[in-house]
Amino acid sequence: MALPGENTKFYETPNHPYQGERIAEESDLLSRYGLKNKEELWRAQSELRDYRREARRLLGQTGTVSGEEFVARLQRIGILSEEERLDDVLSLEVTDVLERRLQTVVYREGLANTMGQARQFVSHGHVTVDGSRVTEPSYTVPVSEENTLAFDETSDLTDELHPARAGAQE
């Protein structure tokens, strides 16, 4: 039990320290999504595990509204699409959670050339979401805020010809 005021871990480490296949898969995800370390991946896996656990609990209950609220919440943050239901939560993968990170959305929207550059733009305060500056690459972008991504007005990156911009002409 953690003492009040002390941080607790928000993730679980793998049970076995060396499994070659798992390590190769984690390394691939780290490079594909521009994650800093495996802790970020383990956090996403723990978040997904919590979603699945909640879905299993809600599937066991009958006649509750909380299942619909849970699905609506996952649809708001973009992990589930509009037509998916509570059963579909069990088939989610860690990539579904990683795709909703601000760092990934900035890259997918074409504001950065690479995932690493997207991470740098976010952590250096060049990106705003819904008009407010967000400096956490792990921020989960709701679907409603996805089209409000932009460079900060005070950033040099607002210039279309800035050399660091994606697709900048030289």
UniProtKB/Swiss-Prot annotation:
GO terms for biological process: ribosomal small subunit biogenesis; translation. The keyword Protease does not apply. Belongs to the universal ribosomal protein uS4 family. Pfam families: S4. Part of the 30S ribosomal subunit. Contacts protein S5. The interaction surface between S4 and S5 is involved in control of translational fidelity. GO terms for molecular function: rRNA binding; structural constituent of ribosome. GO terms for cellular component: small ribosomal subunit. Keywords: Ribonucleoprotein, Ribosomal protein, RNA-binding, rRNA-binding. SMART domains: Ribosomal_S4, S4. One of the primary rRNA binding proteins, it binds directly to 16S rRNA where it nucleates assembly of the body of the 30S subunit. With S5 and S12 plays an important role in translational accuracy. It comes from the Archaea. Residues 100-164 form the S4 RNA-binding domain. This is Small ribosomal subunit protein uS4.
